[in-house]
Amino acid sequence: MKAYKVIKSNIHRKGLCAMRNIKGDERIIEYRGKKITHKQADEDSKYGYDITYLFTLDKKYLLDGDFEFNKARLINHSCNPNCEVLDESKSKIWITAIRNIKKNEELSYDYGFSFDCNYKDHICKCGSKNCVGFIIREGSRWRLKKQINI
């Protein structure tokens, strides 16, 4: 049985949720897309400042997941995620559970955006207790808290 389904999300338009209970460490869905070079991403206006669907594979390549067939692109960011992104082979990216996930729970992961990456353009609506209001990787949230005195 497929582990996920597309839903209307309270976080951001659409999302994915668990269709069954999912165990921690279970692979849920492969993040699929087109392999492009960093140079292509820098030169193509499609990418501009919107890095939402790009994953770095290595020093030369990125994976552009902004395609209809890639349902994993619908997984939203959360400051308290239940999934993580694993790049096990430098060519395939998997979304994997980091804890047990209950049926009908929305799937989420930390997008890992840098504090220096126009964070004000990426507002977070996850609603978790530790949300800082912007999509910033966990290791950089202290910088934002210090800047805005949270």
Question: How would you label these PLM feature ranges?
Answer:
Residues 1-86:
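Catalytic cores of histone-lysine modification enzymes
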Residues 79-150:
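C-terminal SET catalytic tail plus cysteine-rich post-SET Zn-binding segment of SAM-dependent SET-domain
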